[in-house]
UniProtKB/Swiss-Prot annotation:
The entry's keywords: Cytoplasm, Hydrolase, Metal-binding, Nucleotide-binding
Naturally occurring in which organism (per UniProt): Ehrlichia ruminantium (strain Welgevonden)
E.C. number: 3.1.3.5
Broad class of enzyme this protein falls into: hydrolase
Positions annotated to bind a divalent metal cation: D8, D9, S42, N94
Name of the protein: 5'-nucleotidase SurE
Cofactor note: Binds 1 divalent metal cation per subunit.
Recorded catalytic activity of this chain's protein: a ribonucleoside 5'-phosphate + H2O = a ribonucleoside + phosphate
Residues making up the signal peptide according to the UniProt record: none
Family stated for the protein in its record: Belongs to the SurE nucleotidase family.
Principal subcellular localization: cytoplasm
Function: Nucleotidase that shows phosphatase activity on nucleoside 5'-monophosphates.
One Pfam assignment: SurE
Compartments reported by the entry: Cytoplasm
Length: 252
């Protein structure tokens, strides 16, 4: 099986290195490609480099660094960089979960979505970490990811235009839960940077996902992660609110 790895934390991030090591040890891939952004693109969503020159640097015959977004990286990988399309795309392992509203911002999910857009099985993978220490433990992916990939690849009813969004909890995993996305109210952790010019100020958004204390009433993947479960959520492209659409059509 030919597997393409990408991410949104950048080519040199520890998460994608851990992912490659897991895939190698699992023995599920006969060929592994890595095509990932040059820089950290967290929060980039599905933005692409349109009408701009995008530099692609070859590291090896199967490893490339793209000076652009996660979506651009995979878009080019599938159309220009790889000699054959992959059988599977794995995006991650992201430094931090992508749960609830996170999926709208996530470059990790977006990279996987580029594969799903042309019906290639695509899985986004994220790992919760300790916000205080910043340390990330890869034990849960190392223990469970091979099993999850094999399970999903054997699901006959998986519509390949659907992204499978997998999140690993910080604590030792209690098991796996298939969950809906869930939702939260974004937090307001914004720092105003020092400036002597009041007419030209800058801000740093330091956090969007609320901490566990402030998301206690949340449901779906958010609740399951906080309870210590690995979550798997199928995500589709069509975001139409069909209930509202039906009501709008009744206005005719």
């Amino acid at each position: 099986m030919r597997v393409l790895l990408s991410n949104d934390d950048g080519f040199h991030a520890n998460g994608i290195k851990a992912l490659k090591e897991i895939v190698i040890k699992s023995g599920i891939a006969s060929e592994i490609w890595v095509v990932a952004p040059l820089n950290n693109c967290s929060g980039s969503g599905r933005s692409v480099g349109l009408n701009v020159k995008v530099q692609v640097s070859k590291v090896s015959d199967t490893e490339f660094i793209v000076d652009s977004t996660p979506s651009t990286s995979v878009f080019l990988a599938l159309r220009k960089i790889m000699n054959y399309k992959p059988d599977l795309i794995l995006s991650g392992i992201n430094h931090g979960v992508n749960i609830g509203n996170d999926v709208w911002y996530s470059g990790t999910v977006a990279a996987a979505a580029e594969g799903a857009a042309i019906n290639i099985p695509s899985i986004a993978i994220s790992q919760e970490y300790d916000n205080k220490s910043g340390e990330i433990n890869w034990v849960n992916p190392q223990r469970f990811l091979k099993q999850i990939i094999e399970m999903l690849m054997n699901v006959s009813f998986w519509n390949k235009s659907t992204v499978m969004n997998v999140n690993f909890p910080l604590m030792p995993a209690k098991g796996i839960k298939f969950t809906d996305q869930g939702k939260y109210v974004p937090c307001n952790e914004i720092e105003k940077n020092e400036s002597s010019d009041d007419s030209n100020v800058s801000y740093t958004i330091t956090r969007i996902t609320p901490n566990k204390k402030n998301r206690a009433q949340c449901d779906g993947s958010i609740k399951a992660i906080d309870e210590g479960y690995i979550t798997i959520t199928p995500l589709k492209f069509d975001m139409t609110d069909f209930d509202v659409l039906t009501s709008l059509n009744s206005l005719k």
